[in-house]
Amino acid sequence: MRQAPHRLIDICDPTEAYSAARFREDALREVELIRDAGRLPLLVGGTMLYFRALERGLSPLPSADPDVRRELEREAQELGWQTLHSRLAQVDPQAARRIHPNDPQRIQRALEVYRLTGMPMSEWFARLVDADRLPYRLVKLVLAPGDRDVLGARIADRFHAMLEQGFLEEVKALRERPGLGPDQPSMRSVGYRQAWAYLDGRLTRDEMIERAIIATRQYAKRQLTWLRSESGAERFDALSPTLLNKVLKWLDGISCLHQTDL
């Protein structure tokens, strides 16, 4: 990250909610600024739903309804979010496959959309409006590891490195923040959720580490599934020792990269 300027990192307070719609606005603004400076933006990530929103635009999903949300929260308190996830699987199997059973924010939103409209959220996403597509040509590269065992080991190494670099101290400091609790979207993300439970005394250190690593591996699996369905993308084995040469050769072979390309 020291070798090139990065945008849209550390732009929100942990108490703030962040959406795909807001990301699209922020990303389009940064793309224009980079192009105005005569540079080529590289979009790197990440959360595939956000990338798809940037590329294709957003369907006009209904706004949040406080009454429906309160109803869903009451049901979750009585039955548990995993039961609500099972209900989601009945009305929107595609969304249920994409959303983890321990992700109450997205389970709630998907069920809310269905209850408000009678239409599954996945169908809303399928109706993304072409008129709002990204007004550039995208050159898409997918870098995915060919060996899942290596990926799993690197995920474990990464979390251990995070702990060594003060991750728990970061979460302890966040716990002192007013208005920030374990139900905030930022604190339900992978790693933070398990660390918070450990600091609450609900998990041992070993349990925290194991669950955080498992959750990260599950997240990586979902990302790889999404990447396999990404159309118009060139795929490379991220573990190949000749990866750089292969990518550069492929880029050299792309003809007529216009000024409107990304």
Briefly describe each language-model feature range.
Residues 1-262:
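Phosphate/pyrophosphate-binding catalytic cores of soluble transferases and nucleic-acid-acting enzymes
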